[in-house]
Amino acid sequence: MEKDLQLRVNEKLDVENILKDLDKYTPKRRGWTWRQPAENLQMGPFIYKDASTPLENSVALPSAKYFGDIDPQPLPVITTEIASGRFEDDIRRMRMAAWHGADHIMVIRTAGQSHYDGLIEGTPQGIGGVPITRKQVRAQRKALDLIEEEVGRPINYHSYVSGVAGPDIAVMFAEEGVNGAHQDPQYNVLYRNINMIRSFIDACESKTIMAWADMAQIDGAHNANATAREAWKVMPELMVQHALNSIFSLKVGMKKSNICLSTVPPTAPPAPSMYLDLPYAVALREMFEGYRMRAQMNTKYMEASTREATVTHVLNLLISKLTRADIQSTITPDEGRNVPWHIYNIEACDTAKQALIGMDGLMDMVQLKREGVLGDTVRELKERAVLFMEEIIEAGGYFNAVEQGFFVDSGYYPERNGDGIARQINGGIGAGTVFERDEDYMAPVTAHFGYNNVKQYDEALVSEPSKLIDGCTLEVPEKIVYIDELDENDNVNVRMEETKEFRHSSMIKPEVEWQADGTVLLTMFLPTSKRVAEFAAIEFAKKMNLEEVEVINREVMQEAEGTRIELKGRVPFSIDINSLVIPPEPEILSEDEIREDIEKTPLKIVAATVGEDEHSVGLREVIDIKHGGIEKYGVEVHYLGTSVPVEKLVDAAIELKADAILASTIISHDDIHYKNMKRIHELAVEKGIRDKIMIGCGGTQVTPEVAVKQGVDAGFGRGSKGIHVATFLVKKRREMREGK
């Protein structure tokens, strides 16, 4: 990799640089990569049973700060879907996702690309996805080559090999180093109405190419779940669809270990989802032993609440843990209300990492109870699926079954309601475009399915036909015809010209999806009904000078008492970060300097949690030697306990001739924490000791600047440690001695 393209942790990824010399780029590797198990991994104080090799660079979970900032990685590959319509902005999001543990980046195609009869070129903007083109794929794979070096783990790049141009896309993906793809002819037939004969013939070619490139294949059975009227009734059919594509792929020549079943828990609360979904997950994994499981998250039963979606997805993760998942796919919790935003891709990755690591070693302690309802339901599901397959055979095969509307029927098989999706064998897009090859047909290319009369030219090259032309594009990338742009207006260069100010200056704007899109999210509670709250919220946002305001979530707290509203809008301005007045980070003294100062002049403090407050953990961590508190530096601490009246704390300071008062206050109702701080200061003034004593106050809801306004010397907020308090005590005492 060129030196000037190496990423630096504290520098933004240069998308403009990525786009340079794409005509000369070739992928550094092919094939899918699985995570490497790290048996009995020791990280911090813990040993992990189901973890993989850690990353070299990553962003740990927020609570990792309590455990030495460790960032253990679960064993399943973690998927995130990134496709905003502008691939150039997605590259930046891919870097963020990789730092949060994603190693499978899936790019959804723009709406309608399934029906394009050939490849498209250039970089047009997409709708509901990204136009998949050679330039776009090459740029993103090139960026991922850099990103995977930065984080220290291979990243799998993935899109879709389906639609009318499936084989064309498969060849391009193999040429460009794409590592995985969806490929399932049933998707074409049922959901895109592409002729079934054409779809299966094309699938033979596509799967052969994917097998050559060692791509992982994900099937399309999960679409039946998303399409069905009542998803929990489609489980037998899901198993049939998995079976058809899996055995078909195996027969074409794919490795079993690269064939992944796209399985999704069919339901979500308030349905009894574990009771319904777990037996299905168990049955599927038992029937398809040896195949890979790509565990998807439920999208059918999602509304606009990100909290609700996250809980559903954690339940999905529990099923993955109780059964098996080789790839754990994630769904952004905002998918029910908008095209996914940057932050929600990251939230989804963190949800998967947090849940799976939290359940590390779980199966060493629990096992599924096979006697009773679980075992009975598993057997029943298998029986229903087998009967479904037998009926397909009786009907004359898959094509006839599709014509008769067997699939995505709302009945729970063997019940049928007659409302399934029906397609005609000789109908659909691409009908009549399949022809038998002539006897002298020959294609001098690698990974070509079916009859190929190479023998007529060179019998020795039957298994290596591309040698007839000194290699095809799969072996000789220089033969690839690279097309840059076709549309002079709808392309990445025009879009990036519009936003270059935000890459080449100190100007900044909020964004959620595209660079400098200006979108912000507001959450508010309004004490009124849902309908009134929605329009009141819009008016509030307009008075805040937001533009293009749209309510994206409404949740009733109580019909009369109030509604939670979430809305988005655009800020019509940017700011210059060079004009910001940013106070310097507080200086922290070295431990040696603190100890030396206190050894020369001993320091005594009194400490307590004040008011009617029983919280003590935070204050004890700041004080106790075992937590790295101020005792370790030689500070003499007199701890008075919790719920201590402020008068008692000040009196104790006088009685003990203390140098400082430390007060902890967690409860913040009606600003009682700040009122207590002000009262401590006032009492110290009244009793004539304020100029002789230091006062520091802290708590999770404390803002240091606001605390100082109450008259105390320092405030300590969330995340403050003993060394921060010790630094304050030493520095403040020096100032007092010097009369500052």
Swiss-Prot record:
Gene3D superfamilies: Cobalamin-binding domain, D-Lysine 5,6-aminomutase alpha subunit, D-lysine 5,6-aminomutase beta subunit KamE, N-terminal domain. PROSITE patterns: B12_BINDING. Its cofactor is adenosylcob(III)alamin; pyridoxal 5'-phosphate. SUPFAM superfamilies: Cobalamin (vitamin B12)-binding domain, Cobalamin (vitamin B12)-dependent enzymes. Increased activity in the presence of dithiothreitol (DTT) in vitro. Inhibited by 1 mM potassium phosphate and potassium chloride. Inhibited by L-alpha-ornithine, D,L-alpha-lysine, L-beta-lysine (50%-60%), L-alpha-lysine (26%) and by delta-amino-n-valeric acid to a lesser extent. Significant decrease in activity is observed in the presence of 0.2 mM p-chloromercuribenzoate, N-ethylmaleimide and also by 2 mM iodoacetate to a lesser extent but not inhibited by arsenite. Changing residue 615 to G: Loss of corrinoid-binding ability. The keyword Metal-binding applies. The modification N6-(pyridoxal phosphate)lysine is found at residue 626. OraE may be the catalytic subunit. Active only on D-ornithine and 2,4-diaminopentanoic acid but not active on L-ornithine, L-beta-lysine, L-alpha-lysine or D-alpha-lysine. It comes from the Bacteria. InterPro entries: Cbl-dep_enz_cat, Cobalamin-bd, Cobalamin-bd_sf, KamE_N, KamE_N_sf, Lys-AminoMut_A, Lys-AminoMut_asu_sf, OraE-like. Signal peptide: none annotated. The keyword Isomerase applies. Transmembrane segments: none annotated. It is an enzyme of class 5 (isomerase). Keywords: Cobalamin, Cobalt, Isomerase, Metal-binding, Pyridoxal phosphate. Optimum pH is 9.0 or between 8.5-8.7 (with Tris-HCl buffer). Half-maximal activity is observed at pH 7.4 and 9.7. Substrate binds at residues 81, 160, 182, 294-296. It catalyses: D-ornithine = (2R,4S)-2,4-diaminopentanoate. Its EC number is 5.4.3.5. This is D-ornithine 4,5-aminomutase subunit beta. Heterotetramer of 2 alpha (OraS) and 2 beta (OraE) subunits. GO terms for molecular function: cobalamin binding; D-ornithine 4,5-aminomutase activity; metal ion binding; protein dimerization activity. Optimum temperature is 37 degrees Celsius for native enzyme. Displays half-maximal activity at 23 degrees Celsius and 49 degrees Celsius. Rapidly inactivated at temperatures above 45 degrees Celsius. Loses more than 35% and 30% of its activity when stored at -20 degrees Celsius for 1 month and at 4 degrees Celsius for 48 hours, respectively. It holds the Pfam family Lys-AminoMut_A. Adenosylcob(III)alamin binds at residues 614-616, 664-669, 700, 720.
